[in-house]
């Protein structure tokens, strides 16, 4: 499980583990499921969704939305297609072309926190993580973690630059095989995150080709209730679940810790979808 760029490395890691298990490579890893929160998985779909989300949330005007859709979105889509066939340089080009969409939206957003549009951006990362950095860089903590003298930073420029080639690649492609073999997938997203917003995530999940796609698309959204209050909207069929989390931004566990914990507990126990079954039974009985 992971969030944000985990939308890339969680599917890749899960696919590799599953492949190794199928081929009896080394020690069998008992992979049961994977979960991604506000992730970037299918850039072609998610970047195209930026203008729609920004318009829906009142960040940009209809005029700006339409201009983005006519000029920058088609250029992004073409660049991503080339990235998928021509390797490294074209993927860097796609990164530049597609992030013009995001940059243009931010230009109109007026200093909004792109991880939580209800807030203003503070510092280079839009959040103050200085206390976390101080804690993790204590010598006693580094010794406990076994990382030696490596200094922790919230965002490593070196790692960021190394991953630019990978950024615009579609990591959804390995997921259908996992679903077909009964490995569970939970995609969840806080509703106020812009950068990896719930709308783009919902769209790639709905567009994904697998044997249960038709049934998943046709299934209804039902309330995800925590302590008697609606904490989100849940959609599920078979091994696939999608949860839009209310009153949360990019970092759901930070914004809604109780809801996040309950989500993970129910999902790992296999009971997250039971609320959907109960809702459908209630409708049928009526």
UniProtKB/Swiss-Prot annotation:
Q: Where does substrate bind?
A: 196
- Active site residues according to the UniProt entry: 4, 193, 250
Q: Which residues are glycosylated?
A: 227
* An annotated Gene Ontology molecular function: serine-type carboxypeptidase activity
Which Enzyme Commission number(s) are listed? 3.4.16.-
GO biological-process terms attached to the record:
proteolysis
The record's keywords, sorted A to Z, are: Carboxypeptidase, Disulfide bond, Glycoprotein, Hydrolase, Protease
State the similarity comment.
Belongs to the peptidase S10 family.
Listed name of the protein: Serine carboxypeptidase-like
């Amino acid at each position: 499980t992971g969030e944000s760029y985990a939308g890339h490395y969680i599917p890749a890691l899960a696919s590799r583990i599953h492949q190794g298990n199928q081929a009896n490579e080394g020690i069998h890893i008992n992979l049961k499921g994977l979960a991604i929160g506000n992730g970037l998985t299918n850039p072609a779909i998610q970047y195209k969704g930026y203008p729609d989300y920004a318009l829906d949330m009142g960040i940009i005007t209809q005029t700006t939305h339409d201009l983005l859709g006519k000029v920058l979105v088609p250029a992004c889509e073409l660049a991503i297609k080339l990235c998928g066939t021509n390797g490294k340089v074209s993927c860097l080009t796609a990164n530049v072309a597609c992030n013009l969409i995001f940059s243009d939206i931010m230009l109109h957003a007026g200093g909004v926190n792109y991880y939580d549009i209800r807030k203003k951006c503070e510092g280079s990362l839009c959040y103050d993580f200085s206390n976390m950095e101080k804690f993790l860089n204590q010598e006693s903590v580094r010794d406990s973690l076994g990382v030696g003298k490596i200094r922790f930073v919230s965002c490593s420029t070196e790692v960021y630059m190394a991953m630019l080639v990978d950024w615009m690649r579609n990591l959804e492609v390995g997921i259908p095989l996992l679903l077909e073999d009964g490995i569970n997938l939970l995609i969840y997203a806080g509703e106020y995150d812009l950068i990896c917003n719930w709308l783009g995530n919902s769209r790639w999940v709905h567009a994904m080709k697998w044997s249960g796609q038709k049934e998943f698309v046709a299934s209804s959204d039902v309330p995800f209730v925590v302590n008697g209050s609606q904490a989100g909207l849940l959609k599920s069929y078979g091994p696939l679940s999608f949860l839009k989390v209310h009153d949360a931004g990019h970092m759901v566990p930070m914004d809604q810790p109780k809801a996040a914990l309950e989500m993970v507990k129910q999902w790992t126990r296999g009971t997250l979808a039971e609320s959907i079954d109960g809702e459908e039974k209630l409708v049928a009985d009526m």
